Swiss-Prot record:
Further details from the record: In contrast to other lysine histone methyltransferases, it does not contain a SET domain, suggesting the existence of another mechanism for methylation of lysine residues of histones.
Subunit structure: Interacts with zfp-1 (via C-terminus) to form a heterodimer known as the zfp-1-dot-1.1 complex or DotCom complex.
Record-linked CDD domains: AdoMet_MTases
Residue ranges of every copy of the DOT1 domain listed in the record: 54-369
Organism: Caenorhabditis elegans
Annotated Basic and acidic residues bias: 1-18, 368-409, 464-484
Name of protein: Histone-lysine N-methyltransferase, H3 lysine-79 specific
Subcellular location: Nucleus; Chromosome
Amino acid sequence: MSEADAGARDESPSRTAEEPAAAMRIKEERRSSSVDVVDVGNGELLVLHSIFYQGKTLRLPGNRAHMYPVVFQMIKGVCSLVKQLVVAFPKGWDQNTPSISEIAALTKSFNRVAKPFASNWSGSYNTDTLKEWGEPNCSAEVAKAITTYAYECAVPRPADLNQHYKSFTSETYGETNPEQLISIIDELNIGPQDVFVDLGSGIGQLVCLTAAYAKCKKSVGIELSQVPSNFAQDLAGYFKKFMSHFGKNHGKFEHIQGDFLNPKFKQLICEEATVIFINNFAFDAALMLRINTELLQDLKHGTRIVTTKELGTNKKEITFRSTSDINAISHTTELKTTESAVSWTSSHVKFWLTTIDHTKLIKYYEDQRRRQEVKSSREGSEISDGRDMGLKKRKSQRESSVHPDKLQKTEQAAASSHQSPKWNEPDTDYTPPAKKPKKEKLLREQQDATPASSHHHGASSSSGKDREKEKEKKKNKIYEEKKVKTPKPPKSSSSRYSSETPTSHHHHHRSNSISHSSDVIRPSQPKATAPPPPLVPAPARATASTPPPAPPAARAQSPKREEPLEPPTDLIHHGGGQLDAKTMNALHTIREAATTSAQAAAIQDAINSVLSQPTEASPSAFGPPLAHLPAPVAIYPTPPPPPAPAPAAPQQASAAPAAPNVMPVCTEIAAEQRHTFMIPPTDPFYNMIVSYYFAMKQFCNQSKTADPEFVGRLRLDIEAEEARRAELKESITLTSTQIDELLATGVNTLKSRLDELGMPSVTDVTELLAGSKQIVTQHKGLTNTVAQMENSVAVEEQKLRLIGGPDAVRYFDEAMSHPNVDIAKLTDLVITTRPPNFVAQILLPDDSPTASIDSKVSPSSSSSRRPRQPKPRANNTAAGAGGGGKRGTSGGRKSDGGGGGGATEDVELEIRQFVQHALKVDNAVKEKERKARGNFMAAAADRIPR
């Protein structure tokens, strides 16, 4: 059993198995009860007896002063539970923290009283008196208190923890308070089935707290720095002692010194760990990237990660680019936060829970596989459709080789009708219709062929008639098939609107196009996108059961082009007069403005309604159709009066009266045919409004019926937008990471510069400005001091030269370079090394007040002149004794008088020389000051950022 497992116990120990051990422990405590501070070699042990069931005697080093307050707090806590233990203590013992000697005395008294309690309570947890402290398992408060005791014993000076790392790095030390960890354990329901791993555990107090409160199967802390690891080992030892003293059970725990990114820890982190705690608040981006790629991506399913900085965001969808992100295999939620959750700040710090869920990525790949299968199946169906189309094309080619005339006519008939579903589709083999011959040419050919056929033999004519009848039958059959055939909905938007309107007028148009008057100019072939509306005679549209018009062969029997044609009956005004050419041209222009079948039907209906109204105006005064269009139904709900029947032509007098010229009403677009657009068809915006209307109508129909193609396109658009959104979010995340890295680099650079400038504790811009001003002021003061000192040095050097000679400064510098300087010897050396013609200068007191004591020479003093006198002064006493007093007196007066005149001249000369030297020195000092100021300004200019 390892050292870390020494404190592990069963939650329900056997009383019979523990009684012998308890008896032995009582004997051991009795042997040591008389001595509370035991000498062990050079140190001492502080002994404290336990009153808890299965508790062991606590022995702490007695030579460490910081442990005595911990023992005092323990005694105080036990006495608050058992009031009888304070009988031997003096009054007011718990008011203030006593000294070390007083704590030792209290410990001795406590051991004396606690011994009988331990004997009486042996074999019982005594939870009635000890409350939660008597339980074998730790509650939240008990685990917190025991961990705090161990922390205070292991770390005598917590401030030392803030000195072993560099500021603003990933090794920055910060502690999570025990209250926050207890809240996390309760919220995540961490228990004996979990393996708790703290990456960057510091001194390991969270590992010990988890082992005490959650009793995990294993709690491991990994720390890189050496100093916190040493404290963690001490903390583990004291934690085991305190747990044994209080008789508590705890799980296995271990503190490891090393880098948690080392591959040797990967099995522990990725395979065994179920709960991982990472205080990544100060981790830089590079370290977080390594953690994500080297550890988090390999975690097993269900692993829970608690962090102080969010690892990822809850993205709803996974894209191909985000499959390698932590968000693709995890869910992130915010945990509850207590007050003062961390030690480095009083602000609110969030804690995040990231749960590994590999099923997210599995579901994503399954969805991708299903989409690929659907796509491949669609492609296979398209290929099969293409094969069918190829077969049809080859079949049509074979038919064209056998019956070229028949195929050509069939294609022309199909091209003339715009109901072909594939006439404008880009993905089909569409052949544009051949140009039809002009109607006049066809009429001439038919008329020329009629008289020629009358001269043939009877048998040949009969056979020719049979062939003509067969051809007519075939053509009628083809015509009926085309008319009955339901067209396929086209794909292009231009043909989308024509599919919702009746198309019978397209078939009638070919047979009646030649019924127009010769004054109307019509194109030889209608436009592919805007077929003109038909001009069908009224009798042909009398009823819905009217048979289709005659085939082209029957139309060959029509009269020649040169014969005058009767005006169409639908262009005959109900007033009895025929419309003039100008009005007919206007009507045809209006009809040609239609681009879709719906517009053509609406225009024809409007024209019919206008022509059916009786009017008293003459045909020549008939205005354009726009002036006679009926008002919208929504505004004028009263229907117009029934139109009067048109007068019959002379050749049709015996026939029944023709029905009104009205287009058949379509139930789907009845409102459109009754002019609900509220604008005339000739308006420039009419086509655009109608096209928008039908496009919106088709869109609504597809939405209501949930068209698979429409739903598929909509889903593809949604997926594309979601992918775009995911890419933008990922780009934002990468950009934010880069910004954070740059900000961290800038902050580190700023901190290093502030450390160099002596401002390591700056936390605000105001403090930075104040420190900058202080540095500038200090620099100015130092500059002034240097200038003054240089001035003083120059003055002193000049004085030294004046007094000691030109080489005095050199001797002085050489002597000052030695550690021990003898001023007397230096003075003698200066004096002896003077040149023979050296004359000591006199310094005036006004110019050099500091040198008046050392080097000022009085004008009346002869000490400075004695070395220059060849003869010594005569002794006045000897002169008096020799009887030459008068001579001596006169000689003395002469000497005094002569000496006084020479001294005055010498003094004046020395004064002039001194003034000259003083001026030179002053000029030199000023020049130095000027240079110093210039250098300072240049240095200041260089420091200013550009």
